[in-house]
Regions:
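Alpha-helical subdomain
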Residues: 1-111
Length: 111
């Protein structure tokens, strides 16, 4: 999930690269602003809006092992918002892994 312009750009890239699109059922590639297949979800949402996110993930099999991948997300939020997001996903999925990438270095203003 991401902001509208980012999701639309990602959908366009996925559709244009067979290396990526071959992993997704073609019937799930009709929209320009989301991809929602059995194994992959990409949609517009504010990650802090947990009720909306929960609604978008309603059909996901919660018992399956789940990977949540984020990039440059938590560093820009208040610690309480980050904690809320992590706890929210942990409560939705009993078997969840969270992979987070932040562009920081030990000697920068974020480190």
């Amino acid at each position: 999930m991401d902001y509208p312009d980012v999701v639309k750009r990602k959908v366009k890239i996925i559709k244009s690269k067979t290396l990526l699109s071959d992993f997704i059922d073609p019937s799930c590639l009709g929209s320009d602003d989301s991809i929602e297949s059995a194994d992959y979800k990409l949609f517009i949402a504010d990650v802090r809006d947990l009720p909306h996110v929960t609604e978008k993930l309603a059909l996901v099999e919660k018992q399956r092992p789940t990977l949540i991948l984020t990039e440059c997300l938590l560093i820009y939020m208040k610690a309480t918002d980050s904690e809320f997001i992590l706890n929210g996903f942990a409560s939705l999925f009993p078997s969840v892994s969270f992979l987070n990438y932040e562009m920081i270095r030990p000697d920068d203003k974020f480190g």
